[in-house]
Amino acid sequence: MESEFSQSLTPPVSPSALNHYGESAPSRPPCFTCAYEAGREDTGRLSSNGYISRGALKRLLLKLDPAPADFGGDTVDIFDFPWVTETALVESTKLLFGLFRQKVLKLETLVQSSSHDFGQASSLHYEAEELRQQCVLFLSYIKVFIYRFLEPSQSLDEGPVHPFKDAEAQLPSVLVEELFSITLLIGRIGNLPANVQSAFTIQHQGKLFPPSWQLLHLHLDIHWSVLEILHLLEQRMMGQVVYAHQFVNLTGETLTNISLFEDQVNNLFCDLIGLAMNKYNKVRPTETLNTHHYHCLCTKELWILLIHLLEHRSKSIHTQSFWSYINALLQTVLKGTTSGDRDPGFPVHCKDPEGFTWWLLTHLAQIGMHNRNGTAQQEKQLEDNWSFVIGLLKSICDPKKAAQEEQIRVVVHCCLSLSLMWGPNVSAVTTFWEYYSKNLNSSFTVPWLGVSGLGSICRTPLCLLQQAKSCCSPAPVGSSSHTQLYRTANSFHIFLRILALHLSQEHAGGAPWRQIKGRLYSKFHQRRMMELSDMGLLHFLLLFLVLAQCAELEDVASRACDLLAMLPTNSTPLALRALQWRGQLALVLLYLEKGLDVGALAEQLAVYFSQAAREFYLKTTEPSRKLALWAPLSSYLEGVSEVFETSPNLTLSEERLLNEGFGLLLPACRQSELSSALGFLQTVLAQLRRVHQRCGQPSHSVDSPSWAPLPSVAKERHQAVAAALWSHFFPFLCSMRLSQTPPPQLADAAAGFTLLALDMPGSAPQNLQPHPIQSIMQSFGWDEMLHPLLVTHYLNHLLQNGELVSWVSSGQGSGSAQALCVRAWIRCVLQQYLHKSPDAPDARAGRNLDEQLAELTRQVFRLPEVEFVLQRAGLQSAAVKDPKAAMAVFLKAVGRSYCELQLLSERSSAVSRALEYVGDILKYIKPYLQNKSREGLQLAYWTIGCLVKHWSHLLATSKAQQLLFRIVDVLLLPHALLQQDTAAHTQMLSALKDSLPMFLQGLSVAVSVSHSQGAYLKQQQHSVISQYLSRFLPATPSTGAVVNHPVLLAACESTPSPQGERLRKSILHVLRENFLQFKGLAPPPRLAAVLCFLLELLKRNSDRDPALLTIPLPSVLRCLMLVNEPQVKRLSSEVTQLIVERCTAAVGEQPCEHTTAILRAFVDENEGVYDQQVYNVLEVVAVLHPFTVAALIPFLTLSLRKTECKRGLGKNTSLRNGYRRLLALLGDSGQAEMISLEED
């Protein structure tokens, strides 16, 4: 070492000469750096100051000047001294290298002496950076000097030789010796102290780095620069071997530039692999492709540099390729021993040598995808290494090894990555297939992964096909989907991706398929098929679906079906049969995608389904067996549903999947199973209609696939599908329509058939012709025996369809369709309480019915006919949402619109239409009258009450009278209700009490307008009033009971009207004839209550007609005369007072003739019997209105004298005294009559 520094350190050029020569100030040479750059960490972009980004690699490989912009001056500043550019390396080789070693040692000393004092961080950083830059600059100068100034050695002629020439000739050998000494000085990366190696993990967010970071990256710079220099030297020497003479002479070893390059490459790879091995020991299998093998981007860049340099040398001078070096070292790792005597320099005991090898190979292949600019490319930049990989693969797949799934999954994952980067390899595919063909029944799960690692059983054919398709389109290597495959897919699924890659090679002309077709098919035969478990069968299906997608579809599908047919029908577990059907239906879906006819596949599958359905239908089949059979049957339903939903045109024999098996399956289904089956039917019906409608659109031909048939042919195929549906499904729906527990899907399915008949009327069976829509709606919407839930759901589905509403309004054969829809709505509203129960399931059904009724109400009010009726009546329906209130609005609208009609013909038509709306309405409510449901009776009586009130004019016509008579007989005057001792009709009376006012008001109007049956109606009206006046009248006067009496409420009105007056007149007649008649001297029962009722009736109405008011007056006067009970006396007096006042007010000051006539009759009737009582009664009247009694004075005086004459006893003093008291109340007329009496 001392000899190197024995020469003078005086620079060869004096400072005074600098200006003359023109000193060169070279720019900073490229170097390895991890300094932070925005966006670099996220994208993995290499440093902008590195060898690749600065173009050093490209210039090296293209034999260009390593630094064309640098070292152009006569002198160069190296290690703080100026040197002559063209001669410095020749003249001062050992001096320069000595200075270089001095700087390296100084940096090492700085690392050892550095502390964690932040105050010194800045100074240490800049000092270490300066030392490193000086070393890198020197190495860059060596490269430039070799490229520009070094001449190949030539044979020297005998004679004296200039010392410079001699030194120049020896320079290559000296360079090799010095480079070797540098490698000895810095040693191996793996041997660096731990504190230096830890710089790999420094977070590079700041701008200040410790000396250890600078030293570590200087080592990387030196290792790479040595290789660059040796490569440049070899180029300049034109392939001549350069020997290091000093080492040959001293040690006897042969050191050349070639051997030094090889040793340096091997040592560098050993160090890099050792670093990667240390990192791999912390990598979980799930992170295999997520975790890179390099510690930082500098080592990544070093890998890229080595790959391109070695591949370039391999192609240009036929040296070892990159993979040759790596394979030899990895073999050492796998064997665990060193190859030969050379120490590879990395730990030979790895926790998982094979896993590490696969991991490193995969990531090196990824690194190999980078071009000379450091950019990742789609095409491979590095030749593949399949020969080595296949050897590894055969080793891991050896049955003797019994590798676990977690190991196999890593291997397959890595192989997939390699296939994506290098292109598939048939040997890899066949090797894997040999392994998987023996292990198809395995679940390929990794226990410690939990649920995320379990293989998923595809529940539907479409799901199965999608899983297979996902294997046919593997994600790019760097994507998240690809890196997460270890978690999301098992090893078999990953193998299928490799297989698909192999089969999908472009420009291969089918060769990949021919290469492996025999190998794949030969593994399956009847015994092997019978050995398959459910997991094995799933893997079989996925395999063949991938083959069908990527190879010859028809050939693969035929082979798969033949193999599946080998499974015995009787002994195959039903779960396997379900999976088998899903697989075959997935093939059908694939056929549809390709536009191929599915007839053959569908026929075979439909036969299997029909056999299973027949067994399901038989009553001899055990319940447990039926339950198990439902698994494949439901799979078939789901799969066929997906077939129809997927098919773009339904022209590829899809109807073959719909056979007589459905006719056996549907009747045998339980409730939940039937829901699934009917849901399937809805899907098929909807898809058929959708496709058929699209087929008729002009734009259809533009959007259709190239294989789509002509519209006429398509419509024929649609007729075939429709025929299968009508034949195998519709009869069952008809058999279920009268069920008292209809499934919700029944209505939807029936509606689907109705709309199908609308779109394709010719497809309907003969028994529904010539008007199929009307026939179906009669069966499922208008029949009075149908459950309301079915009707509401069915009509809601239909009336939302604009085309069907148009047909209902004016379509051919529609007839009274709108009226029938209204009638069905009214019936459903009326019968809603027949099917409601407090039990939980029924309660849910009740809520469902309420929702459906509300929706049906909205739809019915949108019918054109209903809208017209409401508009003509001037009623708004927008705010009416409650079905009960909406029904009242509709009935009111019908009645009002009838009253506005003038022409007799219009009125006659309106009556007929109105009767169509309600139908046999009494039949709808009959169940309530039998089971005495409180809510039902309330609704029934309230509805019919509205009907009678608002349709009174209409019901009085000859066409509708019978309905009115039946209403009175059934609801108001039923025979059972007339039996006073019956206690079972409390609920009925309660309901009637609330609605009776509407009945009485409507009857009153009907009586007044009826021409043919007015007398009979009037008699019925009196009977109703009499019956319920008595029923609801309390025994003793009770203000609440009397005030809320339904008959009283019916008669009261704020504004007098002729209809109200007629009703009150009828009530007064009933009161007089039935409730105020004395039997001899005995007063009528409940007299006080009756008088209280009469008083309220008169008070709450402002009638002024004396003829009406005086109807009860004779009876009231009699009560006043004969009954001494104080309450009766008071009430009678109040009634009399009210009548007399009203009558007097009506006629003015003159006596009322009606009142006078009644009083005269009263006196005449009771003279000679109740004379004194008569005068007492008249006194009451006289107090109220003396003029009325004064007009009777002549008649009273005559009556008195007649009475005395009859008795023959002369003057009756007591009688005359009573008369005088009366006369005293009558003013002047009374006084004059008293004088006249005195004169008698």
Swiss-Prot record:
<dbReference type="GO" id="GO:0043596">
    <property type="term" value="C:nuclear replication fork"/>
</dbReference>
<dbReference type="InterPro" id="IPR042320">
    <property type="entry name" value="MMS22-like"/>
</dbReference>
<keyword id="KW-0539">Nucleus</keyword>
<comment type="similarity">
    <text>Belongs to the MMS22 family. MMS22L subfamily.</text>
</comment>
<dbReference type="InterPro" id="IPR029425">
    <property type="entry name" value="MMS22L_N"/>
</dbReference>
<keyword id="KW-0238">DNA-binding</keyword>
<keyword id="KW-0156">Chromatin regulator</keyword>
<dbReference type="GO" id="GO:0003697">
    <property type="term" value="F:single-stranded DNA binding"/>
</dbReference>
<comment type="subunit">
    <text>Component of the MMS22L-TONSL complex.</text>
</comment>
<dbReference type="InterPro" id="IPR016024">
    <property type="entry name" value="ARM-type_fold"/>
</dbReference>
<dbReference type="GO" id="GO:0031297">
    <property type="term" value="P:replication fork processing"/>
</dbReference>
<dbReference type="InterPro" id="IPR029424">
    <property type="entry name" value="MMS22L_C"/>
</dbReference>
<dbReference type="GO" id="GO:0090734">
    <property type="term" value="C:site of DNA damage"/>
</dbReference>
<feature type="region of interest" description="Disordered">
    <location>
        <begin position="1"/>
        <end position="26"/>
    </location>
</feature>
<dbReference type="Pfam" id="PF14911">
    <property type="entry name" value="MMS22L_C"/>
</dbReference>
<keyword id="KW-0158">Chromosome</keyword>
<dbReference type="Pfam" id="PF14910">
    <property type="entry name" value="MMS22L_N"/>
</dbReference>
<dbReference type="GO" id="GO:0000724">
    <property type="term" value="P:double-strand break repair via homologous recombination"/>
</dbReference>
<protein>
    <recommendedName>
        <fullName>Protein MMS22-like</fullName>
    </recommendedName>
</protein>
<comment type="function">
    <text>Component of the MMS22L-TONSL complex, a complex that promotes homologous recombination-mediated repair of double-strand breaks (DSBs) at stalled or collapsed replication forks. The MMS22L-TONSL complex is required to maintain genome integrity during DNA replication. It mediates the assembly of RAD51 filaments on single-stranded DNA (ssDNA): the MMS22L-TONSL complex is recruited to DSBs following histone replacement by histone chaperones and eviction of the replication protein A complex (RPA/RP-A) from DSBs.</text>
</comment>
<keyword id="KW-0234">DNA repair</keyword>
<keyword id="KW-0227">DNA damage</keyword>
<dbReference type="GO" id="GO:0006325">
    <property type="term" value="P:chromatin organization"/>
</dbReference>
<feature type="compositionally biased region" description="Polar residues">
    <location>
        <begin position="1"/>
        <end position="11"/>
    </location>
</feature>
